[in-house]
Amino acid sequence: MQHTVDIQAIESKLNFTFSHPRLLITALTHPSYRNEFPSAEEDSERLEFLGDAVLGLVVTEHLFLLFPALNEGLLSTTRAALVNAEACFEYTQKLSLGEHLLIGRGEKMQSHRGKISAYANLFEAILGAVYLDGGLSPARQIIVPLLPDKESILPLMLVNPKNRLQQFTQQTLKVLPSYKALPWKSEDGSPGYHVQVFVNGDLWGEGFAGSKKEAEKLAAKQALSTHDNKN
């Protein structure tokens, strides 16, 4: 049984009225839903692709104007913290958009990770739809109020070991660290990542974890503990 979409309720949450509501319906359509209901003409994947770029542009512009003295490296890592899946999941939650997602019955969303991914993709797809329908301005009006204020953004730059390492290497060596991810298996056979962090071609640290993001953090933390006496 196909579900109906309460377009007006979503428009109210977004404070945006679609000239082409079909774009919104497409944004709500998870690929698994289209697999179960072939009458759904298109799923959200292409709009996700577009929305990801829109989000990145708006957040980049926001940070650029908010922090006029911040260097490119810290702007980049701060942006990453504001556009990643966890951040997009939180934006979806703030707007209460998740309840409108059209998703197949067979799609597993029981795990928290699965829900984060689905909701993050939904947010990006909706941004893509808003951009196509109304341009960059309404997309910006949706995104910017969801972002943390300046005082809340500042700690994001230093709490993450990757950000701290980048700041340290830029200040002391005028270079950025680079990361290399390799496949890895834990003792119980679970797949994961072995990440190495290099500075000026030298290995500074390593990390092992189930996710690449966590392994990168561990590698950066080891690099800091070895090379930065303040940590």
Swiss-Prot record:
Q: Report domain RNase III positions.
A: 7-135
Name of the protein in its database record: Ribonuclease 3
The record lists the catalysed reaction(s) as: Endonucleolytic cleavage to 5'-phosphomonoester
Going by the record, the broad EC class of this enzyme is hydrolase
Output the SMART domains linked to this UniProt entry: DSRM, RIBOc
Give a GO cellular-component term.
cytoplasm
Which sequence ranges are marked TM in the entry?
none
PANTHER family for the chain: RIBONUCLEASE 3 (PTHR11207:SF0), RIBONUCLEASE III (PTHR11207)
| Catalytic site | D52, E124
Q: Where is the DRBM domain?
A: 160-229
Q: How does it assemble?
A: Homodimer.
Primary role = Digests double-stranded RNA. Involved in the processing of primary rRNA transcript to yield the immediate precursors to the large and small rRNAs (23S and 16S). Processes some mRNAs, and tRNAs when they are encoded in the rRNA operon. Processes pre-crRNA and tracrRNA of type II CRISPR loci if present in the organism.
Q: Which family does it belong to?
A: Belongs to the ribonuclease III family.
Q: Which UniProt keywords apply?
A: Cytoplasm, Endonuclease, Hydrolase, Magnesium, Metal-binding, mRNA processing, Nuclease, RNA-binding, rRNA processing, rRNA-binding, tRNA processing
Name its species: Chlamydia trachomatis serovar L2 (strain ATCC VR-902B / DSM 19102 / 434/Bu)
Query: According to its UniProt record, where is this protein mainly located?
Result: cytoplasm
Q: Which GO molecular function annotations are given, in alphabetical order? A: double-stranded RNA binding; metal ion binding; ribonuclease III activity; rRNA binding
Gene behind this protein: rnc
Q: What is its EC number?
A: 3.1.26.3
Its annotated compartments are: Cytoplasm
